Amino acid sequence: MNSCNNIAITPELIAQHGLKSDEYQHILTLIGREPTFTELGIFSAMWNEHCSYKSSKKWLKTLPIKGKCVIQGPGENAGVIDIGKGQCVVFKMESHNHPSYIEPYQGAATGMGGILRDVFTMGARPVAAMNALRFGSPNHPRTRHLVAGVVSGIGGYSNAFGVPTVGGEVNFDERYNGNILVNAFVAGIAKTDSIFYSKAQGVGLPVVYLGAKTGRDGVGGAMMASAEFNDSIDEKRPTVQVGDPFIEKCLLEACLELMELKAIVAIQDMGAAGLTSSAVEMGAKGNLGIQLNLDKVPTREENMTAYEIMLSESQERMLMVLKPELKKRAAAIFQKWGLHFSIIGKTTDDLRFRVTHQGEEVVNLPIKELGDEAPVYDRPWIEPTLKPTLKAEEVKKIENFADVLLKLLNSANQSSRRWVYEQYDTLIQGNTLVRPGGDAGVIRVSNNDKRALAFSCDVTPRYCEADPYEGGKQAVVECWRNISTTGATPLAATDNLNFGNPENPKIMGQLVFAIKGISEACRVLDFPIVSGNVSLYNETNGEAILPTPTIAGVGLLDNWSKTVTIGGMQNKDSIVLIGPCGSHLGQSIYARNILNIDAGAPPHIDLQLEKKHGQFVRDVIHRGFVNAAHDISDGGLALALAEMVIKASKGIRIKLSNKSPQHAELFGEDQARYILAVKPHALNSLKELAQVNEISLTELGTVEGNSLNIDSILNLSIDKLTQNYESWFPQFMNEE
């Protein structure tokens, strides 16, 4: 007997499952009876934000998802884009925020495991990873523990699995004190004629369980990921999954071998809501029913209930619909890799989701209403209140610009991330061309191919809070610029939208306007969103995180030998600014970090100018005019120049244009701007090309000496810059 299904369904139990009273009434109307305890858990898992996107789906539909290179957009395990020669890139970014705060090592590790499965489920071998991490104030007592655990968890899983980490972000702000963000990105390469989908087809076909055994870890994980935190965090620790990267590696190899056999009809990884979600999604997408027998599920713990088996989020598991004539050969492959292969059910034609356990039917529900017809809300929202423009003349000028620059370089958010990325294997697989620490990571498509892929992920949360619309646009354009600085053509993006409680109209307004900004930018730049993730309820005791819509993008280089980096400049190169001189100090780190001014609107994003300047930069890189390129973002011109000096270990001498106040020209964060180190013989050709294309270009100076010398108002040696840039993170992590 399933004793768990004898549990009385009370209002308290319904609330514990995160279901509103109107949602429960909808369930009663839908099935015409009271649900069993297991069914209640299934509805709770499938109708929460993490699985259903019920608060955001209306707005996600406005994103541009089509493009000339797009093979598969949102709705599958990951997005797919064509890169030519019969190959495609499969990629996605996904959050594991709540679990990583509760149990940082396992939360981050299993976040990596989940996104890796999303990619190789579709037939792609993972080739690159990134992560975007947001932590609380460095002064908060938990921050150092969380940083250490998350970084170790990501490295422990991705290094053992064998995928290089090529880029990412790490930022600190007190608004993440109670809710850190762990956004993980993975890209893989597949054959365009061998992509595997999750849509079940055919009646009476075997449904097969693949991979590791099912335990009690992660039960209720999807529900936990859709709730606010309070002071009872430790009680949620059992909802965090435990991962094993070595089993995942075996699962990858077994799945790819099985795919070569052409035995798979549909395949889905078991992620949020585990077996429930994978079975329901496969059936609902294919307009088929699914029948499961839980007695056939491999379990690693005794006396597991139907509720626990259905909602476990144990890692390294897949569900597949198999061609029956190939089941013996398929089973042999998984046996060879030491993994479980168990036929646990079949597809049906009745659009019902039926589950039996110990001879008893414990679930009998309509599958479409559970899956792709789950409730969708049009939540009330209010338009964000915008800050007035802050003129540079209104911002105090600090006389010692050298001290300002050194303070920024030695700050939590502008210092080197070497301490982080040196814990990741950045070179495994042998195709990494540009490692973390620059604008974008770059890998070769393969060791005998001239093509390369570039990756970047970006967002500026302080911009998004001041103006979610402009902040959403800026997240896209910075990612697009970073890819462009390598010479790669940006092809497509994935989003990871991290926000607070959508039931708060102010928070919902942030989400709505950020999506509007992202949509407009992606449309103008031909940079479609092909996959993504929404993480809501990132609040603790009513304190919401900064709105953080992370954008990760992929670009393509036809010839990797033409790749340029932030640190490639040579002596006697000309330093050239593409775009306007700095003037905008609103929401700049100069205003916030140096003057403690949280005022002004963020910089306006001119999308046509972004497109024009990005195309020009890629063109001059392809023509071989440029030794180094860097986009200008946080910290403006001064910080960008300092980073180039540090990476190249070469000095720069420049003069300011004096078109703006000096502090604005140095630290203004105007957009659509790049610094290029131009080869001496190519300078005139580049200037002529800029004139023909009506590109704003300013000659600033040259690569020379052993210091960063700006108009004699700032003169800092390479050693001094490097020491300040590299010292903050190790000192922070080694504090006793």
From Swiss-Prot:
Compartments in which it is found: Cytoplasm
Keywords of the record: ATP-binding, Cytoplasm, Ligase, Magnesium, Metal-binding, Nucleotide-binding, Purine biosynthesis
Metabolic or biological pathway: Purine metabolism; IMP biosynthesis via de novo pathway; 5-amino-1-(5-phospho-D-ribosyl)imidazole from N(2)-formyl-N(1)-(5-phospho-D-ribosyl)glycinamide: step 1/2
Protein's recorded name: Phosphoribosylformylglycinamidine synthase subunit PurL
EC supergroup of this enzyme: ligase
Binding site for ATP: 53, 92, 495, 532
GO annotations of cellular component type: cytoplasm
Predominant place of localization: cytoplasm
HAMAP family (alphabetical): PurL_2
Catalytic-site annotation from UniProt: 50, 96
Gene Ontology molecular function, alphabetical: ATP binding; magnesium ion binding; phosphoribosylformylglycinamidine synthase activity
UniProt: Mg(2+) 1 binding residues: 94, 533
Subunit details: Monomer. Part of the FGAM synthase complex composed of 1 PurL, 1 PurQ and 2 PurS subunits.
PANTHER family from the UniProt entry: PHOSPHORIBOSYLFORMYLGLYCINAMIDINE SYNTHASE SUBUNIT PURL
Catalytic activity: N(2)-formyl-N(1)-(5-phospho-beta-D-ribosyl)glycinamide + L-glutamine + ATP + H2O = 2-formamido-N(1)-(5-O-phospho-beta-D-ribosyl)acetamidine + L-glutamate + ADP + phosphate + H(+)
This enzyme's EC code(s): 6.3.5.3
Family: Belongs to the FGAMS family.
Binding site for substrate: 95-98, 117, 241, 313-315, 535
Residues holding Mg(2+) 2: 118, 269
Pfam family of the protein (one): AIRS_C
GO biological processes: 'de novo' IMP biosynthetic process
